[in-house]
Amino acid sequence: MKRKLSSLLLIFIIALAISSCAGREKLLFLNWGEYIDESLITAFENKYNCDVVMDLGDSNEIFYSKVRAGTTVYDVICPSDYMVEKMYRNNMLLKIDFDKYGLTAYKNQELIAPVKAIYEEMHKQTSDVDKENETISDYSTPYLCGTWGIMYSTEVSGLENTIKNEKNSWSILFDRSKTPAGTKIAMYDSSIHAYYAACKYFEDEGLDFNTYEELPSSKLSQIKDLVKGVKFDAWGNDNIKKDIVAGNLDIGFMWTGDFLYYYCENATETVLNAYTNNDAKIDELINVLNEITKDDGEYNINGKSYSIGFDLFIPNDTIAFCDNLVISNQSSNQELAHKFIDFMISNSITVNDVEYTPAYSNTYYVDYNTPYLSVYNKIIDLKYSNPETKELLTLTQEDEDLFKEEIKSTSISNTTLYSTIYDYATSIAFGKYYDKDIVKGNILSAFPRTYINSINTTFNNARA
């Protein structure tokens, strides 16, 4: 989940951390909020006797501004594809050379098809940059990836059928005549992402709104009028998915990974509600989970209906992205930066006799997709009791006995049964909403600052 943190607080944290790093190597890492399993930071610090100072940003544009300003010289940064293009084009990145330091994690990873497609597009967009037979791939390492989708309530009569009609894929955000009366619609509070969605709406209407080209002021005015006419019920970030879960909103545009976190959590809680209400026995819980995670899924018994209450639709031409680990060309600790990237994309690494699985752990922790096939397969394998034979997990009396014992001293969410069902739900969700083979969506365009300002002005005026 990509979250915000006060700039003043961040400055204080960085200053405090740097002052405490005397005598040890330090690495400055610019990242999104809650976008890493922080136990891995500690493990890396222990392995290399160093300190990692993590600063946070909530947009690619902020990343660019921070790095460009040079007030803080970051070693490793985590920008998305289109911002990597911009940094690469402006000579802000260091070529990544794992061979120089004997690091092999990236060589051992195979990319999934959607990330291969994203990198092909990044190569295409930067093919005019002369780097002496080098490409953007030499300056960037995939970290996490995903798409944007439209989260919606399944409790509003008629809404799901409307959304799943591909002809309505973008109009349900911008044309209230396509949704049931009273539908509450939210737009993500990011002008560049809202701009993309609006352009796709106009393209569906047969107009030329190419998302890779700067539009004339007349078309920006059309976008402004469109947004003003919709009168979104909310502009938000994390609050959108929370409000849809709570029933305060019905539709919202967001990162698929942000949706997935709540989906897995609610699916698990729904299954355990059926169990604790005596509407499902221990050996029926996996079946309950399978039923409620189907399209239009419900589990009906004893006159009761159990469902998750919300779902996600991902348009074929949605936003796709890959967030990447890159090294600033101003990095003061280039070797440590290489080791950090190698560590975070490793399948397995041992620190003080403890085995860590960084690439898997980061994916599991944040619920965004992995660029790496081996990690994706490991997530899918969570539903198997034996991944080699593909024998599906079953729950038995032994699981029930353990649950009854654990619940005496802890909450349901801290039990082994909860974790087991959550893992199974995660496997289902990744298979349903992320696909390792099918390419869906387009990356954003690396527009110049002047045009980004025009987009921001357009949306500020529309919301005024």
Placement of each model-derived feature along the sequence:
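Early extracytoplasmic/lumenal segment of secretory-pathway proteins
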Residues: 22-90, 242
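Alpha-to-beta junction loops
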Residues: 69-77, 92-94, 181-184, 246-254
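Short loop->beta-strand "edge-of-pocket" segments that line small-molecule binding or catalytic clefts
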Residues: 171-191
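Extracytoplasmic/periplasmic substrate-recognition and gating elements
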Residues: 270-364
